[in-house]
Amino acid sequence: LAERHIPLIVATGRPLRWLPPVWQQLPVSPLCICMNGALIYDAFRHKILRRTLLQSAELTDIVQSIHRALPEACFAVERSGADTQSQGDGHLPGEFLIAENAEEVWYEQNAPRTTLAALSEEPAAKLLVRCTELSSAEMAEIVRPLVDPVAHVTYSIDSGLLEISHPLATKGKRWRTCWIAGTCRRRP
C-alpha cells in the first residue's frame, strides 16, 4: 500500500482504545476514523487529528432526559483520551467510564466507575445507554425525540444498547474530512 501511495483508513464504531492491536498487525500505520466518526486518529504520529464531541452541558441535558424517560437505564461514556498509552490496566486514562449503578450490565468490568452526574463533567465522544428490559429499537423510539437535533442515536445490535454522539460524528463525514484535508496522502 505504501509503495503504491494508497492510503489505508480504518473506519469503525469502536473506541480508540481497541485499535492498537489492529494497526500493530498492519504493514502501514493507518488513519483511524473511530467512535462512529467522533475521532480521526493518525496511528503513525500517535495523534488525534480531529474530535467531534458532545459537550458537557449537552451531555448533562441528554443524560437527565433519558434518565427521566428510562429510569432503569444504565449509562457509560467513551471519552476521546489524550493518547494511546495505557495506565497498565489495559484502559486509557479517562476513556471508558461507567455510572456506578451499572456494573452488572457492561462487559468491561474493570473499567472505572463514577457517579451518574460525573459522566457528563467532561466532553465525550459517545454516551452509551443500556436497558436490558427493552430492545435497542424500542429504546431508540423513546430516546431519539429527546436528543434530536443535539445528538445522534445509533445502535448495531438489538440487545438494549444505544450509542449517542454528536450529529456530525459519522464515519462517512469524517472520511470526506480526511480526503478534503489531504490527510489521506502518503505519510512518512
Model-derived segments and their meaning:
Residues A2-A99:
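Active-site phosphate-binding/coordination module
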